[in-house]
């Protein structure tokens, strides 16, 4: 588990069946085999320690769902964060390191006190969970939505200078893809509502619930339904 507060950055390159993260990684603390590290928001396990970094195996599923492959091929910069300790401060939000999909940068605008980052995403797979002031992880960075379209196809973030200059956002351009992880609570809430027949089936590639896994949904979540439930 992680917080979305990036500790440092490193360079990514291919290594056998995985990736090699290189750079000045002292900010991550002492590393050991088996440690979990968030690499651009992707939870990877240290499988080998080298002089200037570490190596990690990466499954085909992870390569297909995330942006690690093109970044490794191009030696790109990645955000790095060590796993959360129970004694640590939770300064961002709970991030699992399990990427839900990718979003495309549609616009970057410099503003007096921040950068406005506009991102497009799949409204059915990720956008359905978005709302103003919700938490989201972009390339492993804990951020807050400043707003989003009603259909969930586009959202925007106000990025403060400290976050901009200490993460890979400073290198990103319009058209680049970002790893997206939706807030855990949003996904679990939908799953629980579906189990009680109060929401449409969650977008998942896993097995459908059986007879004991919940009844068929009576209606999708809507503003009218939420009002009837006391929200």
List PLM regions with ranges.
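Conserved loop->alpha-helix
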Residues: 1-231
């Amino acid at each position: 588990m992680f917080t979305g507060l990036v500790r440092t950055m490193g360079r990514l390159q291919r290594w056998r069946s995985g990736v090699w993260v290189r750079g000045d990684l002292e900010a991550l603390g002492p590393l050991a085999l088996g440690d979990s590290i968030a690499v651009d928001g992707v939870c990877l396990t240290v499988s080998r320690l080298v002089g200037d970094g570490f190596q990690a195996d990466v499954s085909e599923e992870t390569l297909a769902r995330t942006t690690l492959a093109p970044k490794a091929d191009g030696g790109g910069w990645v955000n790095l964060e060590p796993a959360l300790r129970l004694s640590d401060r939770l300064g961002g939000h709970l991030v699992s390191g399990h990427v839900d999909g990718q979003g495309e940068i549609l616009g970057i605008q410099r503003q007096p006190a921040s950068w406005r980052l506009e991102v497009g995403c799949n409204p059915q797979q990720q956008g359905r969970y978005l709302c103003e002031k919700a938490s989201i992880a972009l390339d492993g960075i804990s951020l807050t939505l400043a707003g989003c379209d009603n259909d969930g196809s586009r959202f925007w973030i106000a990025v403060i200078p400290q976050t901009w200059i200490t993460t890979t956002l400073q290198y990103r351009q319009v058209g680049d893809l970002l790893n997206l992880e939706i807030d855990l609570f949003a996904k679990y809430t939908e799953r629980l509502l579906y189990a009680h027949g109060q929401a449409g089936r969650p977008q998942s590639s896993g097995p459908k619930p059986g007879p004991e896994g919940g009844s068929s949904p009576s209606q999708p979540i809507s503003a009218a339904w939420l009002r009837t439930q006391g929200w």
